[in-house]
Amino acid sequence: MSLKVFDYEDVQLIPNKCIVNSRSECDTTVILGKHAFKMPIVPANMQTIINESIAEFLAENGYFYIMHRFDGAARIPFVKKMKKRQWISSISVGVKKEECLFVEELAKQGLAPDYITIDIAHGHSNSVIEMIQRIKTHLPETFVIAGNVGTPEAVRELENAGADATKVGIGPGKVCITKIKTGFGTGGWQLAALRWCAKAARKPIIADGGIRTHGDIVKSIRFGATMVMIGSLFAGHEESSGETKIENGIAYKEYFGSASEFQKGEKKNIEGKKIWIQHKGSLKDTLVEMHQDLQSSISYAGGRDLEAIRKVDYVIVKNSIFNGDAI
């Protein structure tokens, strides 16, 4: 099988005639399941990216979020709290035995979260298929996101098992070293993998990993993503979990992968690493900037909403458009 592959930095979208007077007229709203959200983005469900207070802020302000699964006991109180406040509840599960019992416990307590994400590194597996079916049996109203995957076969199989959306991306993230440790993954061709998977999908796809700029969010939408999961761009904020250190008068915050020893607390099956990211200030400011950039993109696409982006032409430029200049 030969597949023409490319990644984010290899692609440029081609503008269409602008039909709005101001980019502020452009609507970045996206629908996922029964809810509409302000933007097609979701912070990665990683310990150094999302925490309860960030989740509450996002839910209150109309953004999608997925709470991480690394504090299992906190999930039921969290769902109760979100439901009490009438905000969306969105959590993650793994596939181990205790997670099966956890799903049954949610059902027993009559606590159906709005969204559950089954979150494992290699999502094309029987354990994920069984977990999808278990959630659909016990919590039929819950929207199930399953991943991560990197092939059309995987997307079809998880959709057929009952997944309402699939998450595409194996190891393209900044703190993911799966591609180095195992030789497998979508690192270096994530955008082409997304396109390949989206062509097979009948349900929404969440692009996960490899997003380095706001323009990459737009490229993901062009190639079939409904939602775009973002780690490193959301790391390093005032509100982020994780340690802060000062070096030569500059503040940095830690950011580590979900399969790193820092998250696991042990050196076993390590496929993530830790990096220090320069402190970025307030998360609110980053969200505002992202929103404005998305509005600009819609105006370049010649439309008024995200749909316009899906139809634009593109070119594949096999040289990096940034020439190594980080924004």
Swiss-Prot record:
Catalysed reactions listed for this entry: IMP + NH4(+) + NADP(+) = GMP + NADPH + 2 H(+)
Any idea what this protein is called?
GMP reductase
EC number assigned by the record: 1.7.1.7
PANTHER family linked: GMP REDUCTASE (PTHR43170:SF5)
List the gene name. guaC
Q: Which family does it belong to?
A: Belongs to the IMPDH/GMPR family. GuaC type 2 subfamily.
Tell me which NCBIfam families the record gives.
GMP_reduct_2, PRK05458.1
**What are the alphabetically sorted keywords of the record?**
NADP, Oxidoreductase
- Signal peptide span: none
Residues binding NADP(+) are: 205-228
Annotated active site? 176 (thioimidate intermediate)
Q: What cystine pairs are annotated? A: none
GO cellular component, alphabetical, reads:
GMP reductase complex
Q: Name one GO molecular function term.
A: GMP reductase activity
Job description of the protein = Catalyzes the irreversible NADPH-dependent deamination of GMP to IMP. It functions in the conversion of nucleobase, nucleoside and nucleotide derivatives of G to A nucleotides, and in maintaining the intracellular balance of A and G nucleotides.
Biological process according to GO = purine nucleotide metabolic process
Q: What is the organism field in this record?
A: Helicobacter pylori (strain ATCC 700392 / 26695)
